[in-house]
Amino acid sequence: MAGYLPPKGYAPSPPPPYPVTPGYPEPALHPGPGQAPVPAQVPAPAPGFALFPSPGPVALGSAAPFLPLPGVPSGLEFLVQIDQILIHQKAERVETFLGWETCNRYELRSGAGQPLGQAAEESNCCARLCCGARRPLRVRLADPGDREVLRLLRPLHCGCSCCPCGLQEMEVQAPPGTTIGHVLQTWHPFLPKFSIQDADRQTVLRVVGPCWTCGCGTDTNFEVKTRDESRSVGRISKQWGGLVREALTDADDFGLQFPLDLDVRVKAVLLGATFLIDYMFFEKRGGAGPSAVTS
């Protein structure tokens, strides 16, 4: 290179063994014979427009539903990975201030606080007025997307629950129209007991409550036991809501615990047992209020 002197002690580099091109030739505008065509140039974008626009904001929609799982009834996928359900009954103003019995409404969450859905009672005012806590009813449970995934049916059984002829029961359907189990009260002279049955009326678990269910200042626990009642595997707990709330309303909070690997159908039937226990022991009796209204 002209004008460049190598430092002392260094010999100039030998010429390379390959021919050196003095420079890149200018591209031909009109290729001649034997020349490859020159690709067309990409047009410059118009002012204000990007050549490669970035994707716009993603529209926020409803949460994606749970994927179907083999062997799990449609809609019960949310029960697979949880071992605890918290049930909060909403307090109705008409019921609080006037004493009129209305249809119950509930919110369901997992033990971690994740919303699982809502449940709403369906019954007529005549049944609430005349039958009170023993009224026949239907409870619809919907997921956060407002899709009905579980239905509870309670028929009218007259008589006292301490008498074998007046035992209460609840049918559990999932999806609605397909029976997956029953909750059947079993007679005992001192303790409230229930059988958790599958679709074939075979007992798989039992629920045993305390002799005195009106706990003041403490939670009321119903133990979920094995079929032979040899050990406890879960619990249905009616949580104490405070003196003012317990005195003025019948809006209750429940906690349901069960093994994580329990069949989802049995989990759903235990959920139905929780609602049946609420109506049997913690709901106003017939004639408690001056009237009943629809909600």
Swiss-Prot record:
Topology within the bilayer: Single-pass type II membrane protein
Keyword match Hydrolase: no
Motif (PPxY motif): 15-18
Catalyzed reactions per annotation: a cardiolipin(in) = a cardiolipin(out); a 1,2-diacyl-sn-glycero-3-phosphoethanolamine(in) = a 1,2-diacyl-sn-glycero-3-phosphoethanolamine(out); a 1,2-diacyl-sn-glycero-3-phosphocholine(in) = a 1,2-diacyl-sn-glycero-3-phosphocholine(out); a 1,2-diacyl-sn-glycero-3-phospho-L-serine(in) = a 1,2-diacyl-sn-glycero-3-phospho-L-serine(out)
Effect of residue 21 to A: Fails to enhance apoptosis mediated by PRKCD activators
Lipidation (S-palmitoyl cysteine): 158, 160, 162-163, 165
Residue numbers covered by motif SH3-binding 1: 7-15
Consequence the record notes for mutating residue 21 to D: Promotes apoptosis, more potent in lipid flippase activity
Resulting phenotype, residue 49 to Y/L: Reduces interaction with PDCD6
Outcome recorded upon mutating residue 258 to V: Reduced phospholipid scramblase activity. Reduced calcium and magnesium-binding. Diminished apoptotic responsiveness. Defective mitochondrial structure and oxidative function. Reduced binding affinity for Pb(2+) and Hg(2+) ions
Major localization class: mitochondrion
Motif (SH3-binding 2): 21-27
Residue spans of biased composition, Pro residues class: 12-40
Motif, SH3-binding 3: chain positions: 65-70
Annotated GO biological process: apoptotic process; cellular response to lipopolysaccharide; cholesterol homeostasis; glucose homeostasis; mitochondrial membrane organization; plasma membrane phospholipid scrambling; regulation of apoptotic process; regulation of release of cytochrome c from mitochondria
Phenotypic consequence of residue 52 to A: Abolishes interaction with PDCD6
Claim: Phosphoprotein is one of the keywords in the record: yes
Membrane-spanning intervals of the chain: 266-282
Subcellular location: Mitochondrion membrane; Mitochondrion inner membrane; Nucleus
Family: Belongs to the phospholipid scramblase family.
Family matches, as PANTHER family: PHOSPHOLIPID SCRAMBLASE 3 (PTHR23248:SF37), PHOSPHOLIPID SCRAMBLASE-RELATED (PTHR23248)
Name of the protein this chain belongs to: Phospholipid scramblase 3
Native source species: Homo sapiens
